[in-house]
Every structure is written in structure tokens, then in C-alpha cells.
Amino acid sequence: MGIVYQKALEFKQKYPMTVGWRLKKNSEVIERHLNPGEKVLYVFVAQKNDNPLDIISTAVVALTNERILIGRKRVVMGYFLDSITPDMFNDLTIKQGPIWGKVIIDTVKEEVILSNIDRNALAEIDDNITMTMIEEKKEYGRDLETKKKDK
């Protein structure tokens, strides 16, 4: 059992109202694309869409020390993988409804909407993503300054 799948199961057990299916297959997509030395810090499950009635777009979202990975295994063949690096990350919006909540990740290119998340998990997701991205952006800025000095 991979670390991403294990953490996805822990999240699902802690927040059972979150809608999510095929966690093992979706987790395998992320594990296939982890870089050597990349550490998985936090994992959660959501639907990658904006429609609360569409419950077949389950994604496993992994926050690593380098980026955010969103993995979805297709039913027949292939998969989808989204990678959001700290330099592409702009903002995070949390929306809470009566049953579920949404996490909206604003990037340079698009808005990534993750829905049907147990409303009790929203604060934990916000804390993990925000704190990690702030730290990684600082590190990314230091790397850019070092490269400029080297030129």
C-alpha cells in the first residue's frame, strides 16, 4: 500500500461525508509521478468539478514539499494528472455549504475547483495548502535570487 493511498484512506475515515471512489487507482496516478526525494505532506479526496450532483469525477489531491498533484484515473484507459507548482499558485478560496464544501485553487492559468468535501475538513485543507505554499514560495524566491547573483 503506497503512502498516498494510505493517507487518502485516513482522510476518508476522518471525514466520511466526503464523496470519493476508486481511491487506490487515483492514488496510483500520483505515486507514479512523484519525483525522487519528493515527500507527501498531506492528502485529501474531492470531486474535480463544480457540480455537487456530479459524483464520478473523484480526484486524490496530494500536497508535497514541491507541488500540489491532482490525480484521476479514467475508468477505461489512461488518467489525468494536474500539477500546481508554487510559482503557479495564486490564491485559495474555501466555500462551505450545508453538507459539503469546495476548495478553489486559483492558478496563473485557471481555477481548479474541488468539490463535495466534508465541510469539517475545509479548515484542515486550508491550513495545509496555505502554509505549505507560503513556505515553498519563499524558497522559490530565494532560488531565483541565487540564480540572478550567479549570472
Could you describe each region identified by the protein language model?
Residues 8, 46, 59-62, 121-123:
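A sequence-composition feature that detects small, non-aromatic residues
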Residues 33, 37:
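Secretory/extracellular carbohydrate-interaction modules
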Residues 1-16, 20-22, 29-32, 53-54, ...:
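Acidic, Ser/Thr- and proline-rich intrinsically disordered linker/docking segments
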Residues 56-70:
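Polybasic phosphoinositide-binding surfaces of eukaryotic membrane-targeting domains
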Residues 44-48, 67, 74:
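Short glycine-rich, polar/acidic loop-and-turn segments at beta strand-coil junctions
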Residues 38-53:
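The phosphoinositide-binding surface of pleckstrin homology
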